[in-house]
Every structure is written in structure tokens, then in C-alpha cells.
Curated annotation (Swiss-Prot):
UniProt disease annotation: PRICKLE2 mutations have been found in patients with myoclonic epilepsy but involvement of this gene in pathogenesis is under debate since some of the patients also carry POLG mutations.
Compositional bias per record (Basic and acidic residues), positions renumbered to this chain: 693-709
Family annotation (SUPFAM superfamilies): Glucocorticoid receptor-like (DNA-binding domain)
Subcellular location: Nucleus membrane
Protein name: Prickle-like protein 2
Sequence ranges of Polar residues compositional bias: 318-327
Residues with the Phosphothreonine modification: T534, T536, T539
Family named by the database record: Belongs to the prickle / espinas / testin family.
One GO CC annotation: nuclear membrane
Segments of this protein annotated with the region Disordered: 314-350, 481-519, 639-709, 822-844
Keyword DNA-binding recorded: no
Low complexity bias spans: 481-493
Subcellular location, principal: nucleus
Length: 844
């Protein structure tokens, strides 16, 4: 296809060629222009013309009506722009610019324009070097000479090209400048800038330079809306400037996430033809919305994911069902609590003393707490049973408890504190650490006789708290000290706060102490004390302090001025449903202590502790068969490691303490008989609390605080319950063959509590001893009336209470020939008084 050149353009090129040929210094034409070529070099013979074109590429030979001819015309327009020489070809020039253009064109023609001369290299000459390629030009070869470059400078025909564009100089027209040859376009650009928009030489004083090129001020504008971009922001697209608005509307990408334009100022993420805003909300996982910035991602079906689970539509942190998710949540929480406890226990052991001091000070209640409200709350809290609390135990782990392992807890609690706690539990350790390691653990603290009395009240309570997993356990409050706590100078500095039980699944897996729990309390009178009791000066004082001791162990020294108490762990009750019931009414199903009766006198707890031991020998089997109903308090108890389960005179002999006194039955609470509501054996005399509002107990807290000072100088007596428990335990060990378990429980001094310790063995073997049903406090007496006054004020008496006289106690215990020392610690003090044999209580 032949493109016909417009007539006007053809006349223009012909005129330009005439002007260039007239002003050039080339040789004269040969006069024999060949008709087959559109243009031939002037002054050559026909054979020389063929020789010249034979040196050029075939596609560039300007045969008539050939591609070479079209290339020639194109190169003439490109290398010799008409608007560089003629004003009429320029679009918008003012008069000054027109004058400059004429001067510029005439100067170039006069100083730089020329045409190459093609002739054979003389044979007589040895040869020459091509200026462009450096090749040899031999004699007789066709060479191109440029008169402006000098007579000795020559080129091969294909090497006569522009220095800038390396294109053959059309019709051998060149412009010489500084020893180099140029085409007309690039020579003009060496002298003046050319506008990238209109392709004209810029003769104005100002221009815009951008992207390495130059524009007229008015020509640098948006290619779409023609807005002048001088001094403005622009975007180049395919060599054309665009304003920001036009570029966004024409070329901006859409975000695959939010379907909005990705602005030029916004970061962009691109993958496989997709585009996203470079933000965490857009470039994120399509399933879980996790940010993928700087992270590997998984493309799938036009979306990106963070993992294979998300690409499959699964929840990587979820479970298969809601039921398993609930169970897993509890299991994970339990393991987390256990792991935190073990790890923290390892790190806190070097700083035990400092930590214990901090715990004592941090757990004390502020002085602005209402004592009456506090005591009422304590009573209500301690009476809660697991069946009334619907919160599972794993939810109560959110409280800021201080966890620790069992070895650390053994050195952070006082036996006197923990014996009165309502949730004490001891672990059954069948392994080597169960019986052999515990005496060694306690030996380092009790080997020194000078320290034994004070260490008896130091912190060694951790062994009580062997964690047990029970889903229906009530949530427990962290123990606190009462509002009137004061540090005793004779106490050990290692006494810490009571630790809340935690789960021990990790220990169970690692082969530590067994987490199989003994859920019944061990009766105090069935244990053998293997260390000295605390002195009287360090024991709690005040008869009404049984209110605090029923919920937390109170330690009073120096006449009650320096008293330290620890609140035990409680379960929150529904106060609206208690109807004024006192501490352990719901917990008295298994013969637990009646807290409301203990507040009656200064030593009311002692008789209950000695009498309750025969009523707490069954627990675990009943709990297993009835796990959701009202649970006995025994299920929360544990034996301290300082108790020695001995077949000897268990619970009745205290080394080094002869002046021990047991309070009369008038000072001890009596329990009303109640019947079991289950399908097992019935015990005719069960403990049941009388309904008495907890406010009545709290109101008399101050009046009975010093009642214990009157009861210090009484002669020692023995308790019948101690000897009965000794006979029972020895017959039990002989029948069961478990005499080797005497060291299963450690040593601990006697203390008082409204809540009895549980017998871990009795809970497991309770059905074997169910026939030993008896009660030591079912007799009546009026002797308590003599004790009912303190400082001239009557001590409030609970309704429907009966007390056993001291004569009855003496009658009950005189026939057993008990040793002179009896270890029944009531209200934390040691007292001894002769008792009469009970008139009404007999052994069944």
C-alpha cells in the first residue's frame, strides 16, 4: 500500500531539498539520475550509484514506490522539521519569537548545514579510518566525506548517521557541531529546548521542565482536561501528563475489599491483577480479617487468606461443637491456672520471707471497714454450700490469687490458721512423698525447740490445700485478715496469706503428688501432735473471737493487743435465702460444727472439736453418690501434714505441755439430734444448728473478746472423745492393716474452728464405722448459766441450747484414765480442768 504524500507537503520538501542542495558544499550532480530511485546522491555515475546503495540495508534503499521511499519521506519530516526553519509552520509565535526563529534558522544554515559527498576512495591512497566505526576504508571503496568536518574525515555509507539518534542522515543532509554530525532535529535541540507538546522550538524566556523534557508554559497541561499543570501535581501516563482527578477517574484501580478508588496518595497492594489499599482493614484475611501486611498469604478464588484453615472456612481457634468448646475452655483454664501456680511457686520460693510479709500487709482489711458488717458477711459466706452456688470453679480463677506449689505452701501458712478454715483439704499421697517426705519437710521448722512454739503459728498451710478438680465447687474468696489484725513480734516472718486452691492437672501428668483428694476432714482428736503447742501468750484471746475463728484463724498475742487473723476461703451464699441462719447450718448434715453455738462462750469450740470426730468418718462415698446436692463441709477439708495419724494415744498427748485444760461442757456448744436424709445408716444424734441470725453474733463481738482471760488457771483434764477416737483409730488400723500410714499427715498444733477438719481416711472408709453412732454433747445442764456473764454484762444465749456441765464431763472421762495432758485447743489456748463423767452419754 502506497501512501500518497499531500501536494503541499511534497512542494515543501522539494523546496527544502532545493535550498539544502543550493547551500550545500557537495560535489556537482553526475547528471545521470537513475529513474528507479526516488533520490540518488549527486555527482555519481550510475554504476557508482548502484555501488553506493548496495552498501545500505535493502529496506532503506529509496526505490520508487518502495518502503525505502516512504522511509525517506518520513525521515525528511523527522530530521528536518519544517517548523524549525519556517514561521508559517509554527502555530503560536508572537512577533518576538518569529524574529528569533528566522535568525535561528539562517544561522544554522550558514554555520552548520551541509551535505555529504559520496565518491570512491582514491586507489593511490593507502587507506583511511571510518569516523564512526573505526573500520578500514581501502582504495576504491565508496566513502562519504563531509566538507565541514574536514577533507581527511570520511565514513562508510551506512555509518554516516546522526550522533544522537544513529539514524541514516536522509539525503546526506547533516549539521556539524563541535566535531560531530547531527540531523537537523537534534542539532536544533542542542541549541534550544523543544516543547514536548507542540514539537516546536521554545523561544520564550520561561518554560516548564518535567520528566526530563521541556514544555511551553501553556502547553504543560492535563492531557484530558487541558488544565495547566505548571506548579501543580500531575501524573504521567504513557508520556502524557494528567491531573490527579482525571487520572483517578481514568486509570485508578478499585480496591477488591472496599470497592473504592485507590487514590494516588494511598498505598496500593497488587497481586495477579488484583488491587487493595495497603491498609490492615483492606489487605487482610477474607475469613478472620487478620492483617496480611508484611505476612505471607494464600490466594484462593479471588480472595486472600492467612492460613489453610481460613481458606477452608474453618475457625482455627474453634472446636467441633459447643459442648467440646465448653469443656475445652474449662480444661484450658484449669491447665493455665495450674501452670501459673507451679511456675510462680518456683520463682517465689527464694523471696518467701519478703513475699509473706507483703501478703500479710496486703491482705489486711482497711480500718474503715465496718466490723459488724464484716463479721456478718463472714458468717454468711462461710455457710454457703456448693449446691447453692452455680458458678463453676473454673470461672472463679479470674480472681487475683497468688498461686504456688505445695512445697512453697507448706512454708507460707500457719497450722493454727488453716485448722479453722472451712475448705481445707489434704491430699492422699500414695507415693514416696506421701509418707516419707512430709516429716522431712516439717522437720526443718520444728527441729528447734526454741522456735517450735512460735513456728506453730507460722505459715505452713500450703500442704492443706491440695487442689482438687470439682466442677460444682463454689467459687472461693481470697483469704483476708480481719480489720483488727496487728503483727505479733513473736510470730515468724514467713507467715503468708492463705492460698486459694488451684487445679493440679499438670502435676498429675508430671508424676507429682497425687491429685486424688480425700474429701472428709480428719477429726482433730484422732491425730497425734508431734510438735509443741503454741504458748498461751500467742494464742487467740476473747470469747467472741470465735466469730472470726469460725471463718478465719485469729491469733492474738499480749492480751489480745496483737492479734493476727486469717479469713478462710468462703462461698458466697444467697443471703436472701438464709433467713438469718448462722454460719454452718447448711453444712451440719455430716456433723459439722455449729458456728452459731460456738459464739456462746470463750471455749465453745473445744468441746465441739472433740465431739465431732465420731461423726465425720463418712463422707466421700456419700459425695460420690450424691455429688450435686447439699455437700457436707467435710468434702472441702484436708489434713495438715503436721498431723500424725498414729495408733497410739492420738489427739490426747502433747509433748512438753502438761498444763492443758479442757473447758467444761457449759462452755461448749451442744448439738441437736437430726436424722440423715439419705439411704445410708442413721446416726441418732446429729449436729444441727439452731437458727440464729448472724447479726446477733456480730453484735457481741466486742463483749466476749476478753472472756478468755478468765479461763486460764484451771486444772488439766482429759476428754473422753480423745480416748474413744484413739481406740477407734487403732482398731481401724489393726483391722485394715494400714499402720504404716501414720506419717501420712504431718504435725500441727491444735486450734479451733467452727468448721471441723475432715478425716481423709474416714471419708474413704466411713461405712466401716457407721455403727459407732454416739454423741458426747447430748446431756443437759444449767451450769452454763454461771458462765453467762462477762464484766457484769450477760452474754447473749442462743435459743433452744443445752449445755453439758463440768460434772458430766468429769463423770464421762474419769473412767478412762487419760494421761495428764490433753490437747484440745479451744480458742487457740491451752486449758485443763477436771471433768466429771457424763451422766447421759454412753458408748453404744
Amino acid at each position: 500500500m502506497v501512501t500518497v504524500m499531500p501536494l503541499e507537503m511534497e512542494k515543501t520538501i522539494s523546496k527544502l531539498m532545493f535550498d539544502f542542495q543550493r547551500n550545500s558544499t557537495s560535489d556537482d550532480d553526475s547528471g545521470c539520475a537513475l529513474e528507479e530511485y526516488a533520490w540518488v546522491p549527486p555527482g555519481l555515475k550510475p554504476e557508482q550509484v548502484h555501488q553506493y546503495y548496495s552498501c545500505l540495508p535493502e529496506e532503506k534503499v529509496p526505490y520508487v514506490n518502495s518502503p525505502g521511499e516512504k522511509l525517506r519521506i518520513k525521515q525528511l519530516l523527522h530530521q528536518l522539521p519544517p517548523h524549525d526553519n519556517e514561521v508559517r509552520y509554527c502555530n503560536s509565535l508572537d512577533e518576538e519569537e518569529k524574529r528569533e526563529l528566522k535568525l535561528f534558522s539562517s544561522q544554522r544554515k550558514r554555520e552548520n548545514l551541509g551535505r555529504g559527498n559520496v565518491r570512491p576512495f582514491p586507489v593511490t591512497m593507502t587507506g583511511a579510518i571510518c569516523e564512526q566505526c573505526g573500520g578500514q576504508i581501502n582504495g576504491g571503496d565508496i566513502a562519504v566525506f563531509a566538507s565541514r568536518a574536514g577533507h581527511g574525515v570520511c565514513w562508510h555509507p551506512p555509518c554516516f548517521v546522526c550522533t544522537v539518534c544513529n539514524e541514516l542522515l536522509v539525503d546526506l543532509i547533516y549539521f556539524y557541531q563541535d566535531g560531530k554530525i547531527y540531523c537537523g532535529r537534534h542539532h536544533a535541540e542542542c541549541l534550544k529546548p523543544r516543547c514536548a507538546a507542540c514539537d516546536e522550538i521554545i523561544f520564550a524566556d520561561e518554560c516548564t521542565e518535567a520528566e526530563g523534557r521541556h514544555w511551553h508554559m501553556k502547553h504543560f497541561c492535563c492531557f484530558e482536561c487541558e488544565t495547566v499543570l505548571g506548579g501543580q501535581r500531575y501524573i504521567m501516563k504513557e508520556g502524557r501528563p494528567y491531573c490527579c482527578h482525571c487520572f483517578e477517574s481514568l486509570y485508578a484501580e478499585y480496591c477488591d475489599t472496599c470497592a473504592q478508588h485507590i487514590g494516588i496518595d494511598q498505598g496500593q497492594m497488587t497481586y495477579d491483577g488484583q488491587h487493595w489499599h495497603a491498609t490492615e482493614t483492606c489487605f487482610c484475611c477474607a475469613h478472620c480479617k487478620k492483617s496480611l501486611l508484611g505476612r505471607p498469604f494464600l490466594p484462593k478464588q479471588g480472595q486472600i487468606f492467612c492460613s489453610r484453615a481460613c481458606s477452608a472456612g474453618e475457625d482455627p481457634n474453634g472446636s467441633d461443637s459447643s459442648d467440646s468448646a465448653f469443656q475445652n475452655a474449662r480444661a484450658k483454664e484449669s491447665r493455665r491456672s495450674a501452670k501459673i501456680g507451679k511456675n510462680k511457686g518456683k520463682t517465689e520460693e527464694p523471696m518467701l520471707n519478703q513475699h509473706s510479709q507483703l501478703q500479710v500487709s496486703s491482705n489486711r482489711l482497711s480500718a474503715d471497714v465496718d466490723p459488724l458488717s464484716l463479721q456478718m458477711d463472714m458468717l454468711s459466706l462461710s455457710s454457703q454450700t456448693p449446691s447453692l452456688n452455680r458458678d463453676p470453679i473454673w470461672r472463679s480463677r479470674e480472681e487475683p490469687y497468688h498461686y504456688g506449689n505445695k512445697m512453697e505452701q507448706n512454708q507460707t501458712q500457719s497450722p493454727l490458721q488453716l485448722l479453722s478454715q472451712c475448705n481445707i483439704r489434704t491430699s492422699y499421697s500414695p507415693g514416696g512423698q506421701g509418707a516419707g517426705a512430709q516429716p522431712e519437710m516439717w522437720g526443718k521448722h520444728f527441729s528447734n525447740p526454741k522456735r517450735s512454739s512460735s513456728l506453730a503459728m507460722t505459715g505452713h498451710a500450703g500442704s492443706f490445700i491440695k487442689e482438687c478438680r470439682e466442677d460444682y465447687y463454689p467459687g472461693r474468696l481470697r483469704s483476708q485478715e480481719s480489720y483488727s489484725d496487728m503483727s505479733s513480734q513473736s510470730f515468724s516472718e514467713t507467715r503468708g496469706s492463705i492460698q486459694v486452691p488451684k487445679y493440679e492437672e499438670e502435676e498429675e501428668e508430671e508424676g507429682g503428688l497425687s491429685t486424688q483428694q480425700c474429701r472428709t476432714r480428719h477429726p482433730i482428736s484422732s491425730l497425734k501432735y508431734t510438735e509443741d503447742m503454741t504458748p498461751t501468750e500467742q494464742t487467740p484471746r476473747g470469747s467472741m473471737e470465735s466469730l472470726a475463728l469460725s471463718n478465719a484463724t485469729g491469733l492474738s498475742a499480749d492480751g489480745g493487743a496483737k492479734r493476727q487473723e486469717h479469713l478462710s476461703r468462703f462461698s458466697m451464699p444467697d443471703l436472701s435465702k438464709d433467713s438469718g441462719m448462722n454460719v454452718s447450718e447448711k453444712l451440719s448434715n455430716m456433723g459439722t460444727l455449729n458456728s452459731s453455738m460456738q459464739f456462746r462462750s470463750a471455749e465453745s469450740v473445744r468441746s465441739l472439736l472433740s465431739a465431732q470426730q465420731y461423726q465425720e468418718m463418712e463422707g466421700n462415698l456419700h459425695q460420690l453418690s450424691n455429688p450435686i446436692g447439699y455437700r457436707d463441709l467435710q468434702s472441702h477439708g484436708r489434713m495438715h501434714q503436721s498431723f500424725d495419724f498414729d495408733g497410739g494415744m492420738a489427739g490426747s498427748k502433747l509433748p512438753g505441755q502438761e498444763g492443758v485444760r479442757i473447758q467444761p461442757m457449759s462452755e461448749r456448744t451442744r448439738r441437736r439430734a437430726t436424722s440423715r436424709d439419705d439411704n445410708r445408716r442413721f446416726r441418732p444424734h446429729r449436729s444441727r444448728r439452731s437458727r440464729r441470725s448472724r447479726s446477733d453474733n456480730a453484735l457481741h463481738l466486742a463483749s466476749e473478746r476478753e472472756a478468755i482471760s478468765r479461763l486460764k488457771d484451771r486444772p488439766p483434764l482429759r476428754a473422753r472423745e480423745d480416748y474413744d477416737q484413739f481406740m477407734r483409730q487403732r482398731s481401724f488400723q489393726e483391722s485394715m492393716g494400714h499402720g504404716s500410714r501414720r506419717d501420712l499427715y504431718g504435725q500441727c498444733p491444735r486450734t479451733v474452728s467452727d468448721l471441723a477438719l475432715q478425716n481423709a481416711f474416714g471419708d474413704r472408709w466411713g461405712p466401716y464405722f457407721a455403727e459407732y453412732d454416739w454423741c458426747s454433747t447430748c446431756s443437759s445442764s444449767s451450769e452454763s448459766d454461771n458462765e453467762g456473764y462477762f464484766l457484769g454484762e450477760p452474754i447473749p444465749q442462743p435459743a433452744r441450747l443445752r449445755y453439758v456441765t463440768s460434772d458430766e464431763l468429769l463423770h464421762k472421762y474419769s473412767s478412762y484414765g487419760l494421761p495428764k495432758s490433753s490437747t484440745l485447743g479451744g480458742r487457740g489456748q491451752l486449758h485443763s480442768r477436771k471433768r466429771q463423767k457424763s451422766k447421759n452419754c454412753i458408748i453404744s
